[in-house]
Structure formats: structure tokens, C-alpha cells
Amino acid sequence: MNILKKIRSHLRYFFLNFFGVDIKFVKKNIFKNIETPEYESINCLYRSQGILHIGAHRGSERYVYDWLGKEVIWIEANPTIFNELKKNLVEFKYQKAYKALLHSKKRDDVDFFLSSNDNASSSIYDFSKDFKDNKLFFQNKIRNISMINKIKLKAYTLDDLILKNSIDIKKFNHWVIDVQGAELEVLKGSIESIKLCNSITVEVSTENFYKEGSKFNDVNEFLNKFNFKVTKDPKRNHEDVIFIRNDIN
């Protein structure tokens, strides 16, 4: 997920519209044929009181969040990447990082696979056989990615992490989840916290990229039970989708 790249160049359009200058989003970049960011994605960030970002990596979106004046909680599982994340957040007073692997339940020994692409596709799941055999491609692009190492980590639920650290979760009512196939596990561990969430951006897959990993239909079915509805079904096999709680004005 690269929210920074998708949003950075379009924030000016949002604020011009907000102040009464009518600018329309084009559907495609005519040179690269890449869809522009959804208006709703920017709107969710703008309307939120604060942001909970699960699967932080190095926190590349920190500048956007800071520019919007948002408090942010970052959660990253990879110990090595987490140390770099902490350094990147030093100058951001209202952004705080926690090192934790989130799961549906507390566990002492969870496999965590480290990917070759700067750990960006690291997951509690290994890649599927179809992906390893080059039968599946992220967004139909050939990418030479593999899991190059495996470590053991302790796992926590989001609800436990919130309680343990006395986080006022109602202040962080837009969530970003980027956990490479573990979306359903993370959500199952947030039964209490999710009641105070208004909107969620989730990176989902529609195909089996990760062995035993969740897919869009799994995430959609789960969130429907908590009164969240997807704004638009995914068009590609691996992309961000936005869920908004139905009773939000």
C-alpha cells in the first residue's frame, strides 16, 4: 500500500473543492493508465479525529498525516523495520509507534515471513504455491518477490494492545490496515475497538497470494457484521478498498 503516492499530488484538489473551487478528478492517468486516488480516501483522512495505521513499515505516510494535522498511532511487527520507523517519527510530536504483531488472539510463537522486497510484503503467511509458481501476479505485474527468512514473534490482539497502553482509541477513528493477508486475523482481535471506528482503508486481495491468507470476501463479510459497507468493490486483484460505517453522517 502506498497511500502517500496516491494522495500527495491530489490533496490540493480536495481543499480547493472544500473552499468552493469546483475541480473534478479524472478517472485515469492518461500516461501511465493508473487510477487516481478515490475522493473518499482523502475525505476519510480529512474527517477523522486521528489515524490508526496497522502495518506501518517505515511510516511513509507520516508527512501527509502531519500536514493534515492528525494524531497517529502506528503499529509495526517487524523489529528491524520498527527501529527505522521510530527514527522516522522523531520530529512528529503527535505520531507514536508501537512494536506489535496483531492477531485474533494472544500467542507466544507466530511465524513471521520476511519478504525480499525490502520486507514490504512480509506476513504471518508464506506466499501461496500459485504465486511461487508464477501463476499469480500482483495487479497483473510480474514481480520477483520471495520470502527470504522467517522469525518467531509474540502476537497480541488490538484490543489488548489498546488496554495495555491506555490508548484512547476513540481519538483514532480512521484505520489503515496493511498486513498482507492477515486482515481478518487483525480484525477478529479488535471486536471492542472497532465499535469506535468510523472508516477503514484495507489493502485486500481477491486471489490467493498468501497461503491461508484472507481475501476481500472474508474481510467484507466480517465488517458487514459491524455495520461497515465497502464504498467500491476492488477492480484489481490486490488493492486498497474503503469501508465506512453505515451510521456515520
What are these regions (language model features)?
Residues 1-249:
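Phosphate/nucleotide-binding beta-alpha loop and adjacent structural elements of enzyme active sites
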